[in-house]
Structure formats: C-alpha cells, structure tokens
C-alpha cells in the first residue's frame, strides 16, 4: 500500500493544502509547531475516522471554521482508492457529514462502513496500524515500555494469532455447551428408562382384555333397547302421518273457504272501481272541450292561424333568428363598452402607480440625504477616534524605546523571567528544606551532648565534650541561612522583573488591540466617505425621477377620461338592444302558452282513453274471478265428504302410547347404559394410551441413546479442536518469535555495529533482553534515552519486515511512517537512524514517510516537503522543494 495524494481544507492549522506523495523516502521538514505531524494525522484520520483521534471530532476542524474536508488517495494491492471525509461543526458538536470510499470493488458510504472496509483491506484496525507502521510523536518507546503481555497482545494481533485464540475460546465454549447438553440428555434418558420400567410392571394388556369383554356385553344390551325404540318410533310416525293428513285436509278446506271469501270481495270492489272510472271519463271529456276554447284565444294573441306543430316551429325559428342577430349586436356593443371601461381603469391605475412611485422616489431621496448627513457626522467622529488611537500607539512605542526588548517580544521576555523566578523559588524551597533538616540534626546533637552521649553514634562518653560534629552542623546551618537570604533576594529581584515584563505585555496587548481598532476605524472612514458621496448622488437622481413620473401620471389621467366618455356612449346602444330582446321574450312566452294548452289537451285525451281501457280490463278480470269462484265452491264440497273423525281418534291414542315408551327408553334406560359404556370406553382408551406411551417411551429411549452417543462423539471432537488451536497458536508464536528475533538482531547489528552491544534475545513470551559484548544482560529500561529510541525503532522495523514477509508470503503493508523519531536522539544516533531508513528501503519498503525538524535527516530523503506556519494568521502551508533549496532555507533560519 502507498499513499499518492492528500488534500485537506480547514484541518487543524491548515486552511487549504494539497500534497502528492511519491515512492521512496519522503521527509516532511519544518520547525517545531509548524504543523508537520498534522499532515500524517490527516492521512490516519482519513483511513480510520474518529478511531484515529486522541480527542474528539471538534479538534480536527480549524478554529473559527464550520467544516473540514480531507481527501486521501492511495494504491493497494494493485487497486486505486480514494477516501473523502467532511466534518461539520454545529453548535458545540461536530459530526461526520460525508464519508465515501471509492475503489475497484465499488463505492462504500458511511463512517463505520468505510472504517470496516479499510480495516479489511489492510488487515489491521487503527490500533494495529499504530503498532505496526505508524510511529507517532512521543510514542517511539511504546513497545519498549510495554509489559511482555501487552507486547505479546500487540504483536499477536498484528500477526493475526489472536484469531486462533478466539477460535480456541469458541471451541472451549462449544465444548462446555456440549457438556451441558450431554448432561441434560443423560438425565432425560435415565428418567425415560424409569418410566418404561413402571409401565411394564402394570400388566396393561390383561387389563385391556377384561375391559373390552365387559364393553361387548353392554353394547349388546344397548342394541336391543335401540331396536325396540325404533319400532315405537315407526308406530309414532304412522299415527302422526294419519293426524297430519287429517290436519292437511282441514287446512286445505279452510284455505278454500278463505279464497272464496276473497274472490267475492274482489269482484265487488272491482265493480265499484268500474263505476268510478266511468265518472272520471265523463269529466275528462268536458275538460278537453274547455281547453279547445282556450287554444283558439291563445292563437289570436300569438298571431297564428292554427296550432299545428309546423306553425309553432316556424314562428319559433323566426324569433330565434331575430334574437341571434340582436344578441350578436349586443355582445359586440358590450365588448366595446367593457374595453373602453377597462382601458380607462388601467390608465387610472397606471396614473396612481406612477404617482405612488414618484412619492416613493421623493421619500427615498430624503432617506438618502439623511443617510449622507448621518454618515458625514460619523466620519468626523471616526477621524477623531483615529487621531486618538494613533497618539496611543505612539505612546506605546515610546514606552518600548527604553525596554530590553522590541514591541511584540514582551511575551517571550515574560516567559523567560517567569521561568527564572520559578527556578529561584525551587532553589529557595530546596534550601529551606535542607535548612530545616540541618537545624533538626543540630538540635538532636545538642540534646545528646547535654545527655553525655556522642553526637555521632549516640553512645555514652566520659569527660569528652565531642563538640567537633556540633560545630560542623552549626556551620552548615549558618551557610544554609546565608544561602536562603541570597535566594530570597534573588526571588524578590526576579519577581520585580516579572512584574515589569507583565507591565510591558499589558502595554503590548493594548497596543495590538489599538492597532486592530485603528485598522477597523480606517476601513469605516473609507466606507463613510464612499457612503456620503454615493447617497447624495442617489438623492438627486431620485428627485429627477419623481418629477418625470408626475408628468407621465398626468398624461395617463387625461387618456382615462377620454376612454370613459366613449364607454358611456356605447352603454346607451347596449340598453336599446336589451329592450328589443325583452320584446322578443314576450312573443316567445305567447308561443309557449299555445304550445302548453295543446299539450294539456292531448294529455287529457290520453288519460281518458287509458281510463276506458282500464274499465274494460276490470270487466274481463271479474269474469275470470267468477269462474274461479264456482270451481272453489265445488272443491270445498268434495273435501267435506272425505274427513273421518273416528280414524283420527285412534291415531291420537297410538301416538300417545308410542311417545310414553320412547320417553322412558330415551330419557332413562339408554342414557344410563350409554354412560356405563362411555366409562368403559374411557378406561379402555386410558389403557391404550398408556400402551402407546410405552411404545413412544421406548422409541424416545432409543433416540436419546443415539443422541447421547452422538454428543459424546462431538464432545471428543470439540476437545481435540480446542487443544489443536492452542497448540497451533503456541507453535506459530514460537516460529514468529524466532523469525522476529533474527530480524531484530539483523536490524540492531546495523544500528549498533562495533558498539558495546552484541545481540538481543526475544523469549517465547515476548520478553526482551539486551546483551553487551561482555555477555552482561540488560533490561531495555537500562539503556539510555537515545539507545531505547533506536532499540524501539529496530523492533518496529523488524515487526514491519515480519508482517511484510510472513503473511501469505508478501502482504501489501501501509507506508512506514515515523513522526519525530529523533526526539530522543543526539547527532550520532540520528546518523544510525538514517542507516536504518536506508536499510528498510533496500529491503523493499516502497514508501517511507518521516516527519522531523532535524536537518540531519534531509540527506536521507528522496523527496523533501517543507511546512511553514504564518505567525500572523497561525495557518500552515506545505510545499515540495529540492534538497539544496531546503538546506539553504534552513541555513537562513
């Protein structure tokens, strides 16, 4: 894997930066704090998002910006990839607004999905990336300072041996699960076998035979009673049939008599209706004659010769033609009148609009004039403020003429003096502590002397004062008191110097603030001068425009008056045409009257004819009804002769006897017998169910036995798998330890050839031991700071080589990234680091990125990148440059 391009906007100190990254060794060079590490952090953040941050998302967005954008392009395993991320700040919270990964496999969107895809591509998450390829600033001793177990976890994760441990744990969990299931199945099997034994002891087959024999006898008795019941039902049915037949004949007789009465009533009612219809026919004849007279009068008023349909249609056609002609003229006249009125209204509205616009122009001119006057007053005020600020700045510059530093350097002076005061205070505190201890020792010596004991050893002495030790301690106390007084004087002097520096910083701060205010006042003066001129010109232009609009409005009002007069003339023509149309409507109403009377007369005649037909129909219906009445009276007489009352009484007695027998058998005898049979059947069913349960239990026992055998086999297989994973992990770890130890010593020999150290031992638990030339074993913590740094870099490079050569033959690892690796190194050790970088490059590492402010690394670079920060804007910039240019720039610095 190789980075090819990084582009960032509003990322930490960068406002807008873009850098192409090439193969070989790239040194990113610049002074401390210029933003070099932020370039590498941008690459790391593009790959892993928030997991690559020590803080929060808000930390990556440039202060004062609303969002940040990062684009990283890289090649991996022959494919080209591009990641775009955008972080947006809303309020106090930052979120990922966009995260897209484009590659040969397609597009992946979303921060989590992109992070998972990157981890899958590189076969390492953010933590593994840092442990393998990215030596972050300040973390150069991370692997050395880690415990062996921590180091083991880091390296195992990188080599993916952690997966074997995960598989072993899964197999162990599976083994425990199988043991739980096996225990449960064995318990169930024992329970089933005890149930089978209990049922076999109950002799269920003999019990079933006895119950079935008793049940057959009871079924025979029930069958006999049911046969007698069926015979009684037959007798009951025959008696009921006789009674039903008699009832049916009686019902039919009643129906016929009812039908005779209905027919007689209907014949009488229809005869009454025929008389009423004859009266209504006579009334309709009289009404038709009266309508004939009304039609003659209407014809005379309508100026028609006859009331035929042709005459009425001709008259209507003539009226329609005249009406069409009048309406065309009326429509044309109305259109003209409306057009004149619309034109007049539009002209009046246009005049009103022009007058309104003229008034607005005049008001706007007044506003512009007032704005110009106000801006002129503000202009005078700003000029006075500028003079005051300029005077204050001159005073501040005069204050620094006698100061030990220039204006703008007071903060550095204050920091130096504060550090000096802190050092003096620390020395004073140490001296006071030593003085306190010396006084305590002197007091103890005097106490021992007074007690007749040696001040040195505390043993009793005889006659010897032994004052030498006491004199020395008194001299020490006096010396420390003198030192304390000197240090107190130094602290007081340095505190006064700090106060003086603080006063200068305050003056400098006020001067900076006034300089900013002066720039702002200059901008406002220029703005107000422009406002005065532009507003006065605008006011004059608007007054001229208002006069032109008033003149145009007067012309529009005169034109509106002319069009209104034309509209009134056309309106008179409209009134005349509407009067002619009203006359035509009167003639049409008279025609409608004639036509209505003719239609009414025709309706009366039609109604009369329908009533006559209905009267004849009723006469025919009554003739048919009288024939039906004669037939029903004959049928009634025949039915009266067929009814036998004695047969009916005999049938009633037989029905009563049969019903009494059926009631006793069905309500008492058969229910009791059936209840006994149901009880026996239930008992038989219970025994049969127990026999079926016995068969089921035997089948279940066989199945459980097979299941237990299978689980025992699975348990053995899972146990074997668990131990296999553990053995394989231990074997692979030992092989990796041996290879890693060899590679580590190869790298260490390169770094420390011909020096005091001979080799490094890496044990199976990843414990590290360094051996000197004389065979003395040392812990890594016993090395110097620079030696530990090179030792750690050697270990990092060895791990990188192991990953590159040991996973599937050759793994496309990310670039080797070193962020400020020289922080713990002196000049001699830096040259060893250069040798190490060249060795890694010679071993096939295609891309190495180094961030450093050290000039010694420039010579090892294939590609040089310079990072600078503008002290005014606090923004960083990046550019690629050639080595001679960089070295010259460094010399200038």
Swiss-Prot record:
GO terms for biological process: double-strand break repair. This is DNA double-strand break repair Rad50 ATPase. The two conserved Cys that bind zinc constitute the zinc-hook, which separates the large intramolecular coiled coil regions. The 2 Cys residues coordinate one molecule of zinc with the help of the 2 Cys residues of the zinc-hook of another Rad50 molecule, thereby forming a V-shaped homodimer. Homodimer. Forms a heterotetramer composed of two Mre11 subunits and two Rad50 subunits. The gene is rad50. Residues 198-451, 477-506, 564-594, 688-721 form a coiled coil. Belongs to the SMC family. RAD50 subfamily. Residues 345-383, 397-436, 507-578, 621-655 are annotated as: Disordered. Keywords: ATP-binding, Coiled coil, DNA damage, DNA repair, Hydrolase, Metal-binding, Nucleotide-binding, Zinc. ATP binds at residues 12, 32-38, 137. One of its GO terms (molecular function) is ATP binding. Residues 404-506 form the Zinc-hook domain. InterPro entries: DSB_repair_ATPase (IPR053480), P-loop_NTPase (IPR027417), Rad50/SbcC_AAA (IPR038729), Rad50_ATPase_archaeal (IPR022982), Zn_hook_RAD50 (IPR013134). It comes from Haloferax volcanii (strain ATCC 29605 / DSM 3757 / JCM 8879 / NBRC 14742 / NCIMB 2012 / VKM B-1768 / DS2). Its cofactor is Zn(2+). PROSITE patterns: ZN_HOOK. Zn(2+) binds at residues 454, 457. HAMAP family: RAD50 (MF_00449). Part of the Rad50/Mre11 complex, which is involved in the early steps of DNA double-strand break (DSB) repair. Rad50 controls the balance between DNA end bridging and DNA resection via ATP-dependent structural rearrangements of the Rad50/Mre11 complex. In polyploid organisms, the Rad50/Mre11 complex appears to restrain the repair of double-strand breaks by homologous recombination, allowing another pathway to act as the primary mode of repair.
């Amino acid at each position: 894997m190789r980075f090819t391009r990084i582009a960032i906007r509003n990322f930490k100190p960068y406002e807008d930066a873009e850098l192409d990254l090439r193969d070989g060794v790239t040194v990113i060079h610049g002074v401390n704090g210029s933003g070099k590490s932020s370039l590498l952090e941008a690459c790391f953040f593009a790959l892993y998002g928030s997991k690559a941050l020590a803080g929060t998302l808000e930390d990556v967005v440039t202060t004062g910006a609303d969002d940040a954008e990062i684009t990283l392009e890289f090649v991996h395993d022959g494919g080209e990839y591009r990641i775009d991320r955008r972080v947006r700040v809303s309020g106090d919270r930052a979120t990922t607004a966009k995260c897209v990964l484009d590659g040969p496999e397609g597009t992946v969107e979303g921060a989590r999905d992109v992070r998972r895809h990157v981890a899958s591509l590189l076969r390492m998450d953010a933590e593994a990336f840092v442990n393998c390829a990215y030596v972050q600033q300040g973390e150069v001793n991370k692997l050395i300072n880690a415990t062996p177990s921590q180091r083991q976890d880091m390296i195992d994760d990188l080599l993916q041996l952690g997966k074997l441990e995960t598989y072993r744990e899964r197999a162990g969990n599976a083994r425990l699960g199988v043991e739980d299931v096996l225990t449960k199945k064995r318990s169930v099997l024992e329970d089933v076998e005890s149930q089978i034994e209990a049922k076999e002891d109950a002799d269920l087959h003999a019990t079933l035979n006895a119950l079935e024999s008793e049940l057959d006898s009871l079924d025979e008795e029930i069958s006999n009673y049911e046969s007698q019941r069926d015979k009684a039902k037959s007798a009951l049915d025959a008696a009921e049939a006789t009674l039903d037949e008699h009832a049916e004949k009686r019902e039919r007789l009643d129906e016929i008599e009812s039908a005779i009465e209905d027919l007689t009533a209907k014949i009488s009612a229809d005869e009454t209706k025929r008389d009423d219809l004859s009266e209504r026919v006579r009334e309709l004849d009289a009404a038709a004659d009266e309508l004939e007279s009304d039609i003659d009068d209407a014809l005379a008023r309508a100026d028609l010769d006859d009331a035929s349909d042709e005459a009425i249609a001709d008259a209507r056609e003539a009226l329609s033609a005249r009406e069409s002609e009048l309406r065309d003229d009326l429509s044309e006249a109305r259109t003209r009148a409306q057009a004149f009125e619309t034109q007049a209204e539009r002209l009046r509205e246009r005049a009103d609009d022009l007058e309104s616009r003229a008034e607005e122009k005049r008001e706007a001119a007044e506003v512009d004039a007032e704005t110009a006057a106000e801006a002129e007053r503000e202009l005078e005020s700003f000029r006075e403020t500028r003079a005051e600020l300029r005077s204050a700045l001159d005073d501040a510059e005069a204050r620094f003429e006698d100061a030990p530093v220039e204006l703008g350097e007071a903060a550095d002076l204050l920091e130096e003096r504060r550090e000096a005061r802190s050092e003096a205070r620390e020395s004073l505190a140490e001296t006071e502590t030593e003085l306190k201890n010396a006084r305590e020792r002197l007091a103890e010596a005097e106490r021992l002397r007074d007690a007749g004991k040696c001040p040195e050893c505390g043993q009793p002495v005889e006659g010897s004062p032994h004052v030498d030790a006491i004199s020395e301690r008194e001299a020490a106390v006096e010396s420390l008191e003198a030192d304390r007084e000197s240090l107190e004087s130094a602290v007081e002097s340095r505190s006064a110097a700090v106060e003086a520096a603080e006063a200068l910083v305050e003056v400098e701060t006020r001067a900076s603030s006034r300089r900013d205010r002066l720039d702002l006042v200059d901008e406002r003066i220029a703005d107000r001068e422009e406002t005065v001129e532009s507003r006065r010109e605008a006011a004059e232009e608007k007054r001229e425009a208002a006069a032109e609009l008033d003149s145009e409005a007067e012309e529009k009002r005169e034109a509106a008056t002319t069009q209104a007069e034309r509209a009134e003339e056309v309106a008179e023509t409209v009134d005349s045409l509407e009067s002619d149309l009203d006359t035509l409507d009167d003639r049409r109403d008279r025609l409608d009257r004639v036509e209505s009377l003719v239609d009414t007369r025709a309706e009366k005649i039609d109604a009369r004819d329908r009533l006559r037909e209905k009267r004849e129909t009723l006469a025919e219906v009554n003739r048919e009804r009288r024939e039906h009445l004669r037939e029903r009276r004959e049928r009634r007489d025949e039915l009266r002769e067929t009814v036998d009352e004695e047969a009916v009484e005999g049938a009633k007695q037989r029905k009563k006897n049969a019903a009494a027998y059926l009631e006793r058998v069905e309500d008492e005898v058969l229910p009791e017998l059936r209840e006994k049979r149901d009880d026996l059947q239930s008992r038989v069913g219970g025994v049969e169910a127990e026999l079926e349960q016995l068969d089921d239990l035997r089948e279940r026992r066989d199945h459980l036995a097979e299941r237990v055998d299978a689980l025992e086999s699975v348990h053995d297989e899972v146990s074997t798998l668990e131990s296999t994973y553990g053995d394989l992990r231990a074997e692979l770890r030992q092989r990796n330890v041996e290879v890693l130890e060899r590679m580590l010593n190869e790298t260490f020999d390169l770094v420390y050839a011909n020096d005091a150290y001979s080799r490094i031992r890496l044990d199976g638990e990843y414990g590290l031991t360094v051996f000197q030339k004389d065979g003395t074993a040392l812990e890594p913590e016993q090395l110097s700071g620079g030696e530990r740094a090179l030792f750690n870099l050697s270990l990092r490079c060895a791990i990188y080589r192991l990953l590159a050569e040991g996973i599937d033959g050759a793994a496309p690892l990310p670039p080797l990234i070193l962020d400020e690796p020289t922080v713990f190194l002196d000049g001699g050790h830096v040259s060893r680091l250069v040798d190490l970088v060249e060795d890694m490059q010679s071993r096939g590492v295609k891309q190495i990125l180094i961030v450093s402010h050290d000039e010694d690394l420039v010579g090892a670079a294939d590609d040089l990148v310079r990072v600078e920060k503008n002290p005014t804007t606090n923004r960083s910039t990046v550019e690629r440059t050639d080595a001679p240019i960089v070295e010259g720039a460094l010399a200038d610095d």
